[in-house]
């Protein structure tokens, strides 16, 4: 008789499988990042980071002329060292309104932009802390002001 795992453990295993599939579409060094943050983050957090990083690399390819001829898998840490604060501010602007790979409109408000920039900050901090990046422009980017939600009574 096989023992069934508790729900949260089943979900964790599903999320690990999903993360492994997602990392196959990201530059190889991203796997190191996910391994490095694994002890301090949940699988759902790492999946959200993987999604956010894929949006970032797509932005670089679509919107930055320096990287326009590159594929997502071809990015290296040396390329990340070339990113400036201005590039990241342009990324924040891009996040407000864009089209995804299925040509669907995507709109992000402050909260969504903050999450994506926070993911990027964690990503840059990890590689800066491990001395694989010389620069950390993400540390210099200010997060958008979060407007409080109305209280409905």
Where are these regions (language model features)?
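N-terminal DNA-binding module of tyrosine recombinases/phage integrases
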Residues: 1-47, 62
